[in-house]
Amino acid sequence: TAGGKEKGNPYHVYLYKVNFNGNNLICLTPEMGSHSINPSSNWDYFVTTYSTTKTAPKSILKDRDGKNLFQLSSSNTDNLKSNGWQEPLEFNVKARDDKTDLFGLMYIPSFYDKNDKYPVLNYIYPGPQSGSVGNYSFMVARRDFQALAELGFIVVAVDAMGTPGRSKSFHDAYYGNMGDNGLPDNIKAIEQLSKKYSGMDLSRVGIWGHSGGGFASTAALLRYPDFYDVAVSSSGNHDNRNYEADWGEKWHGLLEPLGIDSKDNSSEYDVKKTNYDIQANQLFVENLKGKLLIAHGMLDDNVPPSNTMLVVDELIKANKDFDLILFPNKRHGYGDMSNYMMRRKWDYFVKHLKGLEPPKGFSFN
């Protein structure tokens, strides 16, 4: 299977056959969409199930040459739409270099009016092992994107440079600078979309993410304080010197001391003078202007809570106001407290981007 060869969305995956010498590449699943393949044990036959973000899945039995033998199943979105389902808007914009194509999804309120103005929410997961969308097959819902849209926001998720599924150069776009997080592409995408959708209010922009997205959303508020106004950041690996070595070394490179004043050959160095400084959120807290809600599980055995404490410590030292949620006895995900975190996120955006007071005592339980 491979993507990027057929016309349209490069994230759509198709099945091919090819000779051992690399010649005579033939697509066996030309139907537009992302294909999931289930072969027979001898590969004489296979079933492909394919869909797009807007079209529901279909399953077809094919022979090894790609000939359609039988349509096994077909579905549509009629019942979903009759119950108020909103399909996501798939978009294609240019990256920071004004040349590279970027793809993503946008969610707008069911009551969208181009003459009204809506705050923008940017969901981010920078990877680099995956992107904010990644999978462009059909899903009834993606996280709480449409729910947030129904609160009066426009939600944008973009697969920025630095994420997989494209070329190696695309994936390596900011190797050695994990603090980049694809944020220049996210900003560029939102700015371009606002020219097409006049309802997008770029004077009110929020961002959120979890884990790597927590790292990226905090970085957004600290590095681009004139663009992003509010961030909700959970379980972020805010300084990859304090995360798994195989992660930082894979995407940022080996830790190297910089600016050592000592004239001897000592191994001592200043931890604030290394090639990892450019990705460490706690070193940028002086730039905080907007509203920041930061959260972490106290038993997180993926991203140690010390990552968030580094940022908290520097925020306090810099006399900055922020909001903090700590989840006792919770790991990287918050389990039965996840709905609480989602409610707090919704409330935070409603209060600080829409200027409204959230309903008291609301619970998803």
Regions found by a protein language model. Name each.
Residues 128-130, 155:
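Serine-hydrolase catalytic-loop signature spanning alpha/beta hydrolases and amidase-signature enzymes
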Residues 123, 141-151, 157-365:
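Active-site-proximal cap/loop segments of hydrolase catalytic domains
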Residues 1-10, 130, 134:
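Short, conserved, GDST-rich strand-edge loop motifs in beta-rich repeat architectures
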Residues 12-13, 25-116, 140, 146-150, ...:
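Non-catalytic accessory segments flanking enzyme active sites
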Residues 102, 119, 204:
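Alpha/beta-hydrolase fold active-site loops
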Residues 11-14, 133-136, 236:
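Beta-propeller blade termini and top-face loops
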Residues 108, 116-127:
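Short beta-strand element of the alpha/beta-hydrolase
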